[in-house]
Amino acid sequence: MKTSMFLTLTGLVLLFVVCYASESEEKEFPKELLSSIFAADSDFKVEERGCLGDKCDYNNGCCSGYVCSRTWKWCVLAGPWCR
């Protein structure tokens, strides 16, 4: 009787430890995933914003997808409002 209770208690403790370890690994995975996404996202934003807001004139063009604003003389997104 004492042996079966001891084995049951040991099994429950072992189950608790395994569940806790796997849960802590699962918590680390989203953090690593989000940090890698934001690292890649920040690299993309640097490239995307490379021309947005840069000073320009009609001789010195902007990046593709941007046009030189006639009013403010900086690069803005191309659209019907920029004509």
Curated annotation (Swiss-Prot):
GO-annotated molecular function: carbohydrate binding; ion channel inhibitor activity; toxin activity
Protein's name according to its UniProt entry: U5-theraphotoxin-Hs1c
Family per similarity comment: Belongs to the neurotoxin 10 (Hwtx-1) family. 51 (Hntx-8) subfamily. Hntx-8 sub-subfamily.
Disulfide bonds: C51-C63, C56-C68, C62-C75
Record-linked PROSITE patterns: HWTX_1 (PS60021)
InterPro entries assigned to the protein according to its UniProt record, in alphabetical order: Huwentoxin-1 (IPR011696), Huwentoxin_CS1 (IPR013140)
Origin: domain of life: Eukaryota
SUPFAM superfamilies to which the protein is assigned, alphabetical: omega toxin-like
